[in-house]
UniProtKB/Swiss-Prot annotation:
Gene3D superfamilies: NAD(P)-binding Rossmann-like Domain. This is Glyoxylate/hydroxypyruvate reductase A. It is found in: Cytoplasm. Signal peptide: none annotated. The gene is ghrA. GO terms for molecular function: glyoxylate reductase (NADPH) activity; hydroxypyruvate reductase (NADH) activity; hydroxypyruvate reductase (NADPH) activity; NAD binding. It holds the Pfam family 2-Hacid_dh_C. Keywords: Cytoplasm, NAD, NADP, Oxidoreductase. PANTHER family: 2-HACID_DH_C DOMAIN-CONTAINING PROTEIN, D-ISOMER SPECIFIC 2-HYDROXYACID DEHYDROGENASE NAD-BINDING DOMAIN-CONTAINING PROTEIN. It catalyses: glycolate + NADP(+) = glyoxylate + NADPH + H(+); (R)-glycerate + NAD(+) = 3-hydroxypyruvate + NADH + H(+); (R)-glycerate + NADP(+) = 3-hydroxypyruvate + NADPH + H(+). The active site is at 227, 275 (proton donor).
Length: 312
């Protein structure tokens, strides 16, 4: 069994050694331009077209939860990967736990009004504020995949009213499910906090725009943990300036790194992190990949395969 590996920023040598240890029967090598030798599996992130084109692979693993970059490259270069080759993504591998930590900490930050107290502190102003009531602090999760379900589970502990919206209806205990475009407005109408965990598809690009934000309750909060292209940044800034949206926590952006001239940096109601809400944990990723390859070799059914038509 031959495995080729490519990631522009990861510690390639660590990965190769870890994969060799986890899959002793495999010959693992770092792919370099001009390497056309045979391979059974490819582990990639932003791979060059020539790495995959023309190969008779058993499967390709994207080294992250999102596959939008490789799918967009496939649209431009369909010869890059045979349609019959299964494409897998890292559904969790520690990302769910990280998303839970990020989402819960920020929801509690807003619920306890720490954002308001920070603004008061900036002007040396001492004033206790009325508390928010949990029953009025409905949290809506936009996108109900693996990571969305993990975030919902963690928030249930805090007894917030929860709802989710997705392409198809979900049956999560204690979570009100909305499905399809026809139910989006009803979903948004009660969301005091909107957490975006949508996949990046042509249908979801720009979905968080003026029209969507207007359907939220006044003084709502936005937490974007998915992709920057989901948010029309000018529309969000306008909603923040008007007070329609009271605060935003943004981990992802249309351009990354976020340009220094972006008004988001200095907005008093925006908090920024540099795309770190959930990063790939190498040891857990290697365990998932080695387990999945073993299942594929045995002809077993496996989880995590991407539906290329849907984009996730």
């Amino acid at each position: 069994m031959d495995i080729i590996f490519y990631h522009p920023t990861f510690d390639t040598q660590w990965w190769i050694e870890a994969l060799r240890k986890a899959i002793p029967q495999a010959r693992v090598r770092a792919w370099k331009s001009g390497d056309n030798d045979s391979a059974d599996y490819a582990l990639v992130w932003h791979p060059p077209v020539e790495m995959l084109a023309g190969r008779d692979l058993k499967a390709v693993f994207a080294l992250g939860a999102g596959v939008d970059s490789i799918l967009s490259k496939l649209q431009a270069h369909p010869e890059m990967l045979n349609p019959s080759v299964p494409l897998f993504r890292l559904e969790d591998t520690g990302m769910g736990e990280q998303m839970q930590e990020y989402a819960v900490s920020q929801v509690l930050h807003w619920f306890r009004r720490f954002d308001d107290y920070r603004i008061q502190q900036n002007s040396s102003h001492w004033q206790p504020l009325p508390e928010y009531h949990r029953e009025d602090f409905t949290i809506g999760i936009l996108g109900a995949g693996v990571l969305g379900s993990k975030v919902a589970q963690s928030l249930q502990t805090w007894r917030f009213p929860l709802r989710c919206w997705s392409r198809t209806r979900k049956s999560w205990p204690g979570v009100q499910s909305f499905a399809g475009r026809e139910e989006l407005s009803a979903f948004l109408s009660q969301c005091r906090v909107l957490i975006n965990l949508l996949p990046n598809t042509p249908e979801t690009v720009g979905i968080i725009n003026q029209q969507l934000l207007e359907k939220l309750p006044d003084g709502a909060y936005l937490l974007n943990l998915a992709r920057g292209v989901h948010v029309v940044e000018d529309d969000l800034l306008a909603a923040l300036d008007s007070g329609k949206v009271k605060g935003a926590m943004l981990d992802v952006f249309n351009r990354e790194p976020l340009p220094p001239e972006s008004p988001l940096w200095q907005h008093p109601r925006v908090t920024i992190t540099p795309h770190v809400a959930a990063i790939t944990r190498p040891a857990e990723a290697v365990e998932y990949i080695s387990r999945t390859i073993a299942q594929l070799e045995k002809g077993e059914k496996v989880c995590g395969q991407v539906d290329r038509a849907r984009g996730y």
